[in-house]
């Protein structure tokens, strides 16, 4: 690690990303499954986006939120692609201080964006069940709410107070047992006062994931109450199947997120290998699983994909 001396104190100019601890000699082979994961992410979410864009029947609130979710997942994966493949495929383990601080702002912004889309996606079937006659006004309302929340989140991250406080705290962290840098371990290893970082982090998590979790629980409670009131067994089965795919999507976001938070709270007791595996699951599990879940569980998406493939086959 190279250290420079400036007005902020002693600052490291480069960090070393270990990747997966204990498997440094196998990084070339490890790059193969990671490359396949990225192919699945971009291909799967790209197909979802293409199908929703081209099929007019899918231009409905529920599928528009699904498109937002897929787009957010593509952005998260694209932001980690250079670092991850750089480590495993090319052995480029050094990262500059600027490149280290940049994901601290970028990754939470994209991931919070995706989690908010997942929460908003729940309100599509809820609103259509409770107000079926007013469904035509829902896309405009949803779009306005999404843009306002997007703007506020962007405004929080654009001020850059957290990144500046990290630099002012003079980080001394020569090695990171992950394929990317997380703000939690960075803050613990800083040499200055990190109270602002901790308060800001708690506020962001509470106002995004905490609020999303509460709204999701309330929404599914109302959906379940509505579904149980459906007279026909076929309609009940269809509604429960749709809700099941939504639950899988939400769990794909929140389970790795909660697991990684617990691991980092107990970081001094947990092996670096487990931390690395949890961190990678946190980044890669939702983008990989969600396209598979929706292409299988959602009948409309599945049918649109089949029609697209059959049309491509006839053209060939």
Curated annotation (Swiss-Prot):
UniProt record, GO biological process: sensory perception of smell
Keywords annotated in UniProt: Cell membrane, Disulfide bond, G-protein coupled receptor, Glycoprotein, Membrane, Olfaction, Receptor, Sensory transduction, Transducer, Transmembrane, Transmembrane helix
A cellular-component GO term for this protein: membrane
Topology feature Cytoplasmic, residues: 53-63, 126-161, 213-242, 297-316
Presence of keyword Zinc: no
Glycosylation sites: 5
Keyword Glycoprotein attributed: yes
Function, in words: Odorant receptor.
Protein name per its UniProtKB record: Olfactory receptor 51J1
Natural source organism: Homo sapiens
Source organism phylogeny: Eukaryota, Metazoa, Chordata, Craniata, Vertebrata
């Amino acid at each position: 690690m190279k250290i420079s001396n400036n007005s902020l104190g002693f600052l490291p100019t480069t960090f070393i990303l270990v990747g997966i601890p204990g498997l440094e000699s196998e990084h070339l082979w490890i790059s193969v499954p990671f490359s396949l994961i990225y192919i699945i992410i971009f291909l799967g979410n790209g197909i979802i986006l293409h199908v929703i864009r081209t099929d007019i029947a899918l231009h409905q609130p529920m599928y528009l939120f699904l498109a937002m979710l897929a787009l957010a997942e593509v952005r998260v994966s694209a932001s980690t692609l250079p670092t991850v493949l750089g480590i495993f495929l090319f052995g480029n383990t050094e990262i500059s201080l600027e490149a280290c601080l940049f994901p601290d702002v970028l990754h939470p912004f994209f991931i919070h964006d995706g989690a908010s889309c997942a929460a908003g996606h729940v309100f599509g079937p809820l609103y259509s069940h409770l107000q079926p006659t007013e469904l035509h006004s829902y896309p405009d309302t949803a779009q306005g709410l999404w843009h306002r929340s997007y703007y506020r989140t962007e405004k929080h991250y654009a001020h850059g107070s957290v990144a500046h406080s990290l630099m002012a705290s003079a980080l001394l962290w020569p090695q990171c047992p992950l394929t990317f840098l997380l703000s939690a371990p960075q803050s613990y290893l800083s040499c200055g006062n990190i109270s602002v970082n901790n308060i800001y982090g708690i506020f962001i998590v509470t106002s995004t994931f905490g609020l999303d979790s509460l709204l999701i629980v309330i929404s599914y409670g109302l959906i379940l109450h509505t579904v149980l009131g459906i007279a026909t067994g076929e309609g009940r089965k269809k509604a429960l199947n749709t809700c099941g795919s939504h639950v899988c999507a939400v769990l794909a976001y929140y389970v790795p997120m909660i697991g990684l938070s617990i691991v980092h709270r107990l970081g001094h007791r947990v092996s670096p290998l487990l931390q690395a595996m949890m961190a990678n699951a946190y980044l890669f599990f939702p983008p990989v699983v969600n396209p598979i879940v929706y292409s299988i569980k959602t009948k409309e998406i599945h049918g649109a994909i089949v029609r697209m493939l059959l049309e491509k086959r006839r053209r060939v």
